[in-house]
Amino acid sequence: MTQIELIQQRLGESIAVKQQLLEDKQLMQTLARLADAIARCLNAGGKLVICGNGGSASDALHFAGEIVGRFQKERRAWPAVVLNADVASMTAIANDYGYAEVFARQAEAHLKPEDMFIGISTSGNSENVYRALLKAKELGAWTACLVGRDGGRIGRESDYPIIVPCQVTARVQECHITIIHILCEMVENMLTNPERDE
C-alpha cells in the first residue's frame, strides 16, 4: 500500500464510521437528550466532571476547555472539572489506593447531585472510569459517557450513553471529538438562545 492509498483508506474509514452514526436515529435522540441535560445542569448551577485515560484524557481536557472558555459564542464561563488533570491527586490516590481508584476518589470529592459526570473510554470498560461512574451514581449525579465498541460496562450504567460502534480506537476517538464539538454547539445554542424552538 502506498502512502497516498493509506491516507485515502484511513479517511474513508473515518467517514464510514461517521456515516454510520449519522444513520443511527437512537444515537441522535440520545445525543439531543444529553445536550439538553448538560444545558439544564449548567443552567441550574451544576458543573461537568469529566475524565478519561490516554487519548480520552485529552478529549476530556478539550471538552472542558470548550465549556470553561467558549466554543463559538460569546457567553459567560461555565464550570467543568477534569479529573485526569490533577496530577498530584491522581498520583497520591494511585499510590495509596491503586490506579483503579484515581477518578472515583476525586469524584467523591467534587460531585454533587446537581452535577454531571462524563466518562470517556474507547473500550467502554476502563476500570477507573467505571468506578468513578458508579461513585457518581451513588452520589446522585447525572451520568453520561462517550464510549466505543458495544458500549461496555460504562455504556450500560450511564444515563446518557453515546456509543460509537467501532472496534478501532483511532476511529472512535475521531468520532468522540466530533461529538464533543456538536454537544458544545448545542449547549451554547440552548443557553444563549433559551427561547429558540428546537
Task: Please identify what each model-predicted range represents.
Residues 38, 52, 67:
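Conserved hydrophobic/aromatic pocket- or pore-lining residues that grip, position, or stack substrates
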Residues 61-197:
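Glycine-rich phosphate-binding loops that contact phosphosugars or nucleotide phosphates
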Residues 4, 28-31, 80, 100:
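Short, structured helix-loop boundary elements
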